Amino acid sequence: MTFYERTVDLGLKAYKTTLSPFIGRQCRYLPTCSEYAAQALKDHGPLKGSWLAVGRICRCNPLGGSGYDPPPPPKTPRKWKCEE
């Protein structure tokens, strides 16, 4: 885990243990935004995972949607075939 991934993971854990119990469940989606962010970081790395998490947080509002919205699956790298 890189320094950035550890920092974001620590921030998510701090949010879940300190603020989340007092605020209550506010997220309109499943998995919650913090769970989505953790999974996106794990699957896509720090740069794309953060971008996906920010997009999800922006969608989580009264005018946005609701329901089941998991992070997209990671893309498998293309395998180039050399024909001889």
UniProtKB/Swiss-Prot annotation:
Protein name in UniProt: Putative membrane protein insertion efficiency factor
Region of interest: Disordered: 63-84
Pfam families: YidD
HAMAP family: UPF0161_YidD (MF_00386)
Membrane topology per record: Peripheral membrane protein
Subcellular location: Cell inner membrane
Keywords of this entry: Cell inner membrane, Cell membrane, Membrane
Family, similarity comment: Belongs to the UPF0161 family.
Listed GO CC annotations: plasma membrane
Described purpose of this protein according to its UniProt entry: Could be involved in insertion of integral membrane proteins into the membrane.
UniProt lineage: Bacteria, Pseudomonadati, Pseudomonadota, Alphaproteobacteria, Caulobacterales
Primary residence: membrane
